[in-house]
Amino acid sequence: MTEASENASATGGVAVVIVAAGRGARAGQANGPKQYQNIGGRAVIAHTLEIFLAHPRTDRIVVAIHADDHELFRQAAGSQAERVTAIIGGPTRQESVRLGLLALKEHAPGQVLIHDAVRPFVDADLIDRTISAIGENEGALPALPVADTLKRESAAGVVAETVSRSGLHAAQTPQGFPYGPILAAHDKAFQLGRLDFTDDAAIAEWAHIPVKLVPGSPDNVKLTWARDIAMAHQRLSSERTHFPDIRTGNGYDVHAFEPGDHVTLCGVAIPHDKKLSGHSDADVGLHALTDALLATCGAGDIGTHFPPSDPQWKGAASRIFVEHAAKVVRQRGGRIANADITLICEAPRVGPHREAMTAALSRMLGISADRISIKATTNEKLGFVGREEGIAAIATASVVFPGEVPE
């Protein structure tokens, strides 16, 4: 786990509410609600979910959908649907958010991001900026300064005045808040019949919760009109015509046995009559994968980031290393496409624990289980592995980076 995600966990984690219950009349209904329309080969909501599921600082995700959209959501989200909680939203965006916040109550997150499903071009950096700006009793709003000249219309349909754009910003999502205060604000607005707020920063303002502005992104557009869907599809289709920058990294690690009662492999403790010797928990599989991930963006190796001479890593869980490497990859624009680990040992048996290992890696990397492969083989009694003196691991990671392969 990264340092940032460790801090978030200590305060209850960073949850996400994604609002996807709207009917999208302005974008047209010919192809269904806009969050389920196809752009670049997938539904809009699938692009949105991918970003948040992959982000190392986000935790539980709740999606508020329309009562009629169960099958649409299942088809659009695919394997992602198993990793989020879908609830029935309300008749308005405001009520859908309130219901989403209530669905998180038993999990008591420390912070929450609220995002429109129809903003599929949100990026990891914007999410990071928003989370980092959330205070103990202070929200965070990504926004862009208004660039267009603004006119106020009169009742007669003519220009009444030119509005100064000084200090004006266009609000975006995700909007971030400490969980308790924003839930209380939504509940109070509901009880008082104040159902006219158009975003959550407005509710926070009404409830006297300070909201800090953070730089938004020009790419983080909301798909509102039919032409927006067409432009988004064109944008993604155009990006896919380039030869993608797919990079592959390899990692290798080995640890010797010493007296103990279990080994930790790929994040799972396995009972054994020995343990692996190392400065951390000696998870040979995760160490190899950490090197493989870092190799995809030329970011050194595990020893560069977590030197064994540093006492703070003594006995540390190796998931910290993997999640850090995944964050480094994402900060450099990468998207993890696949992770493959081969464990080389005579014992213990890996097969009975493969499913748990895959699930653990899925959580660490923020990718679906079908993009993870964990294999095991013996060394046919040859060498130190064959003599059961230790375990070796080989890992390969594939990462897609933006842009094209340079000539």
UniProtKB/Swiss-Prot annotation:
Keywords: Isoprene biosynthesis, Lyase, Metal-binding, Multifunctional enzyme, Nucleotidyltransferase, Transferase. CDD domains: CDP-ME_synthetase (cd02516), MECDP_synthase (cd00554). SUPFAM superfamilies: IpsF-like, Nucleotide-diphospho-sugar transferases. Disulfide bonds: none annotated. It catalyses: 2-C-methyl-D-erythritol 4-phosphate + CTP + H(+) = 4-CDP-2-C-methyl-D-erythritol + diphosphate; 4-CDP-2-C-methyl-D-erythritol 2-phosphate = 2-C-methyl-D-erythritol 2,4-cyclic diphosphate + CMP. Its EC number is 2.7.7.60, 4.6.1.12. Pathway: Isoprenoid biosynthesis; isopentenyl diphosphate biosynthesis via DXP pathway; isopentenyl diphosphate from 1-deoxy-D-xylulose 5-phosphate: step 2/6; Isoprenoid biosynthesis; isopentenyl diphosphate biosynthesis via DXP pathway; isopentenyl diphosphate from 1-deoxy-D-xylulose 5-phosphate: step 4/6. Residues 247-407 are annotated as: 2-C-methyl-D-erythritol 2,4-cyclodiphosphate synthase. InterPro entries: IspD (IPR001228), IspD/F (IPR026596), IspD/TarI (IPR034683), ISPD_synthase_CS (IPR018294), MECDP_synthase (IPR003526), MECDP_synthase_CS (IPR020555), MECDP_synthase_sf (IPR036571), Nucleotide-diphossugar_trans (IPR029044). Residues 1-246 are annotated as: 2-C-methyl-D-erythritol 4-phosphate cytidylyltransferase. A divalent metal cation binds at residues 253, 255, 287. Its cofactor is a divalent metal cation. GO terms for molecular function: 2-C-methyl-D-erythritol 2,4-cyclodiphosphate synthase activity; 2-C-methyl-D-erythritol 4-phosphate cytidylyltransferase activity; metal ion binding. PANTHER family: 2-C-METHYL-D-ERYTHRITOL 2,4-CYCLODIPHOSPHATE SYNTHASE, CHLOROPLASTIC. This is Bifunctional enzyme IspD/IspF. It comes from Mesorhizobium japonicum (strain LMG 29417 / CECT 9101 / MAFF 303099). The gene is ispDF.
